[in-house]
Amino acid sequence: MAISKQEAAWQPKPDDVPQLMDEADAGNAISQYNLGVCYAKGNGVEVDLAETVRWLRKAAEQGLPQAQFNLGMCLSRGVGVEKNVVEGTMWLNSAAQQGHAEAERILKQWWGD
């Protein structure tokens, strides 16, 4: 999983997860992203990479660049989902267009300038 060190540093307490789930279900993009991170890392829930991708996708579709980046990496590598480099690159491009530096770096590394 390609969650950056800064993003991975957030660690919910087990008691935080029910509220996070409620907020994510209500459509809060940041909570959806954070819930995806929880499922990726096993923070307050069992590790479930399919759930990681599901929540990242919901947040990415709302335009959250860190979710777009992580969804793009999951898709490009086949983590928690069938590998799809074309769709993964699309999400990385979306994140890069919003100034996500790591997405920009990876796209340059993969495809050149």
Predicted regions located by residue number:
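Short helix-capping/linker turns of helical repeat alpha-solenoids
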Residues: D25-N28, K41-N43, D48, E61-L64, ...
